[in-house]
Protein backbone atom coordinates (compact mmCIF):
# COMPACT_ATOMS: atom_id res chain seq x y z
CA UNK A 1 0.00 0.00 0.00
CA UNK A 2 2.81 2.41 0.85
CA UNK A 3 4.44 1.72 -2.51
CA UNK A 4 1.28 2.84 -4.31
CA UNK A 5 1.21 6.15 -2.47
CA UNK A 6 4.87 6.96 -3.08
CA UNK A 7 4.63 7.80 -6.80
CA UNK A 8 1.87 10.32 -6.15
CA UNK A 9 4.18 12.30 -3.89
CA UNK A 10 7.05 12.38 -6.36
CA UNK A 11 7.82 15.56 -8.30
CA UNK A 12 7.12 13.73 -11.57
CA UNK A 13 3.42 13.83 -10.74
CA UNK A 14 3.45 17.43 -9.55
CA UNK A 15 0.84 19.75 -10.98
CA UNK A 16 2.24 23.05 -12.26
CA UNK A 17 0.06 26.02 -11.43
CA UNK A 18 -0.14 28.51 -14.25
CA UNK A 19 -1.59 31.73 -12.95
CA UNK A 20 -0.88 34.91 -14.95
CA UNK A 21 -2.32 37.03 -12.12
CA UNK A 22 0.17 35.48 -9.70
CA UNK A 23 3.04 36.06 -12.09
CA UNK A 24 2.09 39.75 -12.41
CA UNK A 25 1.66 40.17 -8.65
CA UNK A 26 4.94 38.36 -8.03
CA UNK A 27 6.73 40.72 -10.43
CA UNK A 28 5.24 43.72 -8.61
CA UNK A 29 6.14 42.22 -5.24
CA UNK A 30 9.72 41.58 -6.33
CA UNK A 31 10.13 45.17 -7.51
CA UNK A 32 8.59 46.46 -4.26
CA UNK A 33 10.92 44.25 -2.22
CA UNK A 34 13.85 45.74 -4.13
CA UNK A 35 12.75 49.23 -3.08
CA UNK A 36 10.19 50.33 -5.70
CA UNK A 37 7.40 51.31 -3.29
CA UNK A 38 5.13 52.28 -6.19
CA UNK A 39 4.74 48.57 -7.00
CA UNK A 40 3.63 47.68 -3.48
CA UNK A 41 -0.01 48.73 -3.85
CA UNK A 42 -0.33 46.79 -7.11
CA UNK A 43 1.09 43.67 -5.46
CA UNK A 44 -1.24 43.99 -2.45
CA UNK A 45 -4.28 44.49 -4.69
CA UNK A 46 -3.46 41.48 -6.86
CA UNK A 47 -2.66 39.18 -3.94
CA UNK A 48 -5.94 40.21 -2.27
CA UNK A 49 -7.85 38.79 -5.25
CA UNK A 50 -9.14 35.24 -5.13
CA UNK A 51 -6.74 33.05 -7.11
CA UNK A 52 -8.06 31.34 -10.23
CA UNK A 53 -6.90 28.04 -8.73
CA UNK A 54 -8.23 27.75 -5.14
CA UNK A 55 -5.25 25.57 -4.23
CA UNK A 56 -3.08 28.68 -4.66
CA UNK A 57 -4.78 30.44 -1.73
CA UNK A 58 -1.99 29.81 0.82
CA UNK A 59 0.63 31.12 -1.60
CA UNK A 60 -1.41 34.26 -2.28
CA UNK A 61 -2.00 34.77 1.45
CA UNK A 62 1.70 34.41 2.28
CA UNK A 63 2.75 36.93 -0.35
CA UNK A 64 -0.08 39.27 0.67
CA UNK A 65 1.14 39.08 4.25
CA UNK A 66 4.70 39.76 3.24
CA UNK A 67 3.54 42.69 1.09
CA UNK A 68 1.67 44.12 4.07
CA UNK A 69 4.83 43.92 6.18
CA UNK A 70 6.67 45.80 3.43
CA UNK A 71 3.89 48.38 3.58
CA UNK A 72 4.44 48.55 7.34
CA UNK A 73 8.15 49.10 6.81
CA UNK A 74 7.43 51.92 4.35
CA UNK A 75 4.79 53.63 6.52
CA UNK A 76 5.70 56.91 8.20
CA UNK A 77 3.48 56.81 11.26
CA UNK A 78 4.38 54.28 13.97
CA UNK A 79 0.79 53.12 14.37
CA UNK A 80 0.60 52.40 10.64
CA UNK A 81 3.88 50.50 10.80
CA UNK A 82 2.42 48.30 13.53
CA UNK A 83 -0.99 47.96 11.88
CA UNK A 84 0.31 46.83 8.50
CA UNK A 85 2.97 44.55 9.94
CA UNK A 86 0.47 42.87 12.27
CA UNK A 87 -1.98 42.48 9.39
CA UNK A 88 0.76 40.91 7.29
CA UNK A 89 1.84 38.50 9.99
CA UNK A 90 -1.78 37.45 10.53
CA UNK A 91 -2.16 36.73 6.80
CA UNK A 92 1.02 34.63 6.86
CA UNK A 93 -0.20 32.68 9.88
CA UNK A 94 -3.42 31.98 7.98
CA UNK A 95 -1.45 30.85 4.91
CA UNK A 96 0.61 28.41 6.96
CA UNK A 97 -2.52 27.03 8.63
CA UNK A 98 -4.11 26.39 5.21
CA UNK A 99 -1.25 24.23 3.89
CA UNK A 100 -2.28 20.66 3.10
CA UNK A 101 -0.41 17.66 1.62
CA UNK A 102 -1.70 18.56 -1.87
CA UNK A 103 0.39 21.75 -1.69
CA UNK A 104 3.48 19.53 -1.87
CA UNK A 105 2.40 18.52 -5.40
CA UNK A 106 1.24 21.92 -6.68
CA UNK A 107 4.14 23.74 -8.34
CA UNK A 108 4.44 27.51 -8.30
CA UNK A 109 7.22 28.69 -10.59
CA UNK A 110 8.74 25.21 -10.36
CA UNK A 111 8.61 25.09 -6.55
CA UNK A 112 6.12 23.09 -4.46
CA UNK A 113 3.53 25.54 -3.12
CA UNK A 114 4.18 24.30 0.42
CA UNK A 115 7.86 25.25 0.19
CA UNK A 116 7.13 28.58 -1.51
CA UNK A 117 4.64 29.51 1.21
CA UNK A 118 7.01 28.51 3.99
CA UNK A 119 9.94 30.41 2.49
CA UNK A 120 7.91 33.62 2.17
CA UNK A 121 6.80 33.16 5.78
CA UNK A 122 10.32 32.45 7.05
CA UNK A 123 11.85 35.37 5.15
CA UNK A 124 9.21 37.72 6.52
CA UNK A 125 9.51 36.41 10.08
CA UNK A 126 13.28 36.88 9.97
CA UNK A 127 12.94 40.40 8.50
CA UNK A 128 10.51 41.92 11.01
CA UNK A 129 11.96 43.32 14.25
CA UNK A 130 12.02 40.46 16.73
CA UNK A 131 11.85 42.79 19.72
CA UNK A 132 8.36 43.89 18.64
CA UNK A 133 6.89 40.94 16.78
CA UNK A 134 8.72 37.92 18.24
CA UNK A 135 8.76 35.89 15.01
CA UNK A 136 12.44 35.04 14.59
CA UNK A 137 12.09 31.66 16.34
CA UNK A 138 9.16 30.74 14.07
CA UNK A 139 11.21 31.77 11.04
CA UNK A 140 14.14 29.66 12.22
CA UNK A 141 11.82 26.69 12.73
CA UNK A 142 10.38 27.05 9.22
CA UNK A 143 13.88 27.20 7.73
CA UNK A 144 14.87 24.01 9.56
CA UNK A 145 11.65 22.33 8.41
CA UNK A 146 12.40 23.23 4.79
CA UNK A 147 15.97 21.90 5.09
CA UNK A 148 14.57 18.56 6.28
CA UNK A 149 11.97 18.39 3.51
CA UNK A 150 12.56 15.77 0.81
CA UNK A 151 10.97 18.24 -1.63
CA UNK A 152 13.95 20.59 -1.37
CA UNK A 153 16.21 18.35 -3.47
CA UNK A 154 13.97 18.80 -6.52
CA UNK A 155 13.46 22.55 -6.02
CA UNK A 156 15.12 24.88 -8.53
CA UNK A 157 18.59 26.19 -7.72
CA UNK A 158 17.24 29.74 -7.43
CA UNK A 159 14.85 28.68 -4.70
CA UNK A 160 17.62 26.91 -2.79
CA UNK A 161 19.80 30.03 -3.15
CA UNK A 162 16.98 32.17 -1.72
CA UNK A 163 16.70 29.74 1.20
CA UNK A 164 20.45 30.10 1.77
CA UNK A 165 20.09 33.90 1.70
CA UNK A 166 17.29 33.87 4.29
CA UNK A 167 19.38 31.61 6.53
CA UNK A 168 22.30 34.05 6.18
CA UNK A 169 20.01 36.96 7.15
CA UNK A 170 18.87 34.95 10.17
CA UNK A 171 22.46 34.33 11.27
CA UNK A 172 23.22 38.03 10.85
CA UNK A 173 20.14 38.99 12.88
CA UNK A 174 21.13 36.61 15.68
CA UNK A 175 24.54 38.28 16.17
Functional labels for PLM-detected ranges:
Residues 1-9:
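Bacterial N-terminal signal peptides
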Residues 14-71, 75-107, 145-175:
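N-terminal alpha-helical interaction modules that lie
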Residues 63-71, 116-128:
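Short N-proximal segments of mature Sec-exported proteins
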Residues 84-87, 135-141:
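Structural signature of tandem alpha-helical TPR/SEL1-like repeats
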Residues 108-109, 133:
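Short acidic, glycine/proline-enriched loop segments that cap or flank alpha-helices
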Residues 119, 140-143:
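Hydrophobic, well-ordered secondary-structure segments
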Amino acid sequence: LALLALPLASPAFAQPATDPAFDAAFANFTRARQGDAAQLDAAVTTFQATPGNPAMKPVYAAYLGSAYTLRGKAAWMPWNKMKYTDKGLDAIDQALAELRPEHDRLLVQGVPASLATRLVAAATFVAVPDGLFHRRAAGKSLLAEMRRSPLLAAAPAGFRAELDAVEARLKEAEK
